[in-house]
């Protein structure tokens, strides 16, 4: 019997494994809950040795459980910290190895569900209909339905969702018009590729859609549809072509993007078939769609090949950032773009490590997760430190050789989960082939233990600075109080070049004066920018300059954007310069933020646990 490798699950998934899940839910906007049933088809991993099935749950109202259509003995045990409450179901006679049993669980979500956010019509752009969406990563699927909530278990899915409004889910829509049942319609989806529970996703609201590629559509509010289509349609197929050339053909059938309301807490969530995306990517300049390259890359790294626990999360994100940068360099037809993006990422990594402290457990590539909530460890570290490890292997063996390893790795592990050591074994096994004998000495010098377990920054590579040299030169000019800026300084730059410039200025030992900060905002049109990435970076400079005229703008932005990348960093800085405004701004917008975001900002501001 295989060991349980994931410390963030209470399930006995080494004794029973979910093979198929059927989620049959009514979206109740009045009660703000999902109600209905799930059927879990679990395969016995022992020969009648296990007499109970243990599932993860968190604040779920379970009303009945049947085992193979027969009422069963079951109980929901007391809550055990962030892991939630185990649901224990008796299987008195056990089951033979390989035998499949069916558990049908009747349930409703509660107001303590951490995976769902419910928006009133007033919180949507056209004010016509309510909206609901899920965010299950890392361990929030258990707050929707009892399950084996671990990335080490993968299941195929059927979704049957009844709602008065349009529904999308992480499966391919079943052909045909949704059936009408009273005021509701029944939306059906099928997911043929086995996925872990954190990729379970559902959303419902006033949603319209439009084509953006040969197998891709964008879905969003009717008011935002035209702008969202324009933002994405030029690059979607290019991204897909580039990704398929690097790895192998796309496995999921469709690739669609749901642009969510502003309170969505992440840049994107790689839910299969429908990436859930922040509206901050719709900036009217096609400058922020790197997020889509990242989420598309997850179709191979993370979704097809998955880390077996959150302790090895870097295998999902480090690989994805690497593939994202390969995709972007390919479509820009400029290898310097890879390094350019890596330079921006290095800044994010430095900030994350400074925030935790360079010796903190959470700055390691592989992190101990016993007894902790994986959300608390969330940062740029698995993304950027993971990327730097993958990139170091690429440079060590050479791009031509590494490009042969990429499809081998994803073929070997597709539809499976692995840990860091299995990745190491796969790499060493591949490069032990006679054709790579000249690399033997180089490969023998890889410090695997150090890479996995040393805290702090990894070795810094030599970056190609072609695309950032001008950014550094302009930043240096701003160190002089006599410098006279002009709009032409940045008029030919991409949004990311402007971001690099702002990041450099933000790191000045001596901050700008308030007057300089105001000039920068006006002359480079940053204060009024629709590009939230640039606006947030500028506000960091303004707050460090003690430019009090910028504080109302910061507070306004914090009431319009729920993406944690911006919300948490802006609140931390605002808290340092004007704690009263920071607390008032949070209290005013508390219900606007997603539960995950709300809880983490409360910790950042020292306001106690979320209720």
From Swiss-Prot:
EC number(s) per entry: 3.4.11.-, 3.3.2.10
Source species, domain of life: Eukaryota
SMART domains in alphabetical order: Leuk-A4-hydro_C
GO cellular component, one term: nucleus
Subcellular localization, as worded in the UniProt entry: Cytoplasm; Nucleus
Cofactor note: Binds 1 zinc ion per subunit.
Active site: 295, 383
GO biological process: cytoplasm to vacuole targeting by the NVT pathway; lipid metabolic process; peptide catabolic process; protein catabolic process; proteolysis
Gene3D superfamilies for this protein: 3.30.2010.30, Neutral Protease Domain 2, Peptidase M1, leukotriene A4 hydrolase/aminopeptidase C-terminal domain, tricorn interacting facor f3 domain
Cofactor section: Zn(2+)
SUPFAM superfamilies for the chain: ARM repeat, Leukotriene A4 hydrolase N-terminal domain, Metalloproteases ('zincins'), catalytic domain
A single GO molecular function term of this UniProt record: zinc ion binding
Residue numbers binding a peptide: 135-137, 265-270
PROSITE patterns, sorted: ZINC_PROTEASE (PS00142)
Hydrolase recorded as keyword: yes
Binding site residues for Zn(2+): 294, 298, 317
Reactions it catalyzes: an epoxide + H2O = an ethanediol
Similarity comment: Belongs to the peptidase M1 family.
Job of this protein: Aminopeptidase that preferentially cleaves di- and tripeptides. Also has low epoxide hydrolase activity (in vitro). Can hydrolyze the epoxide leukotriene LTA(4) but it forms preferentially 5,6-dihydroxy-7,9,11,14-eicosatetraenoic acid rather than the cytokine leukotriene B(4) as the product compared to the homologous mammalian enzyme (in vitro).
UniProt protein name: Leucine aminopeptidase 2
Species of origin: Chaetomium globosum (strain ATCC 6205 / CBS 148.51 / DSM 1962 / NBRC 6347 / NRRL 1970)
Organismal lineage: Eukaryota, Fungi, Dikarya, Ascomycota, Pezizomycotina
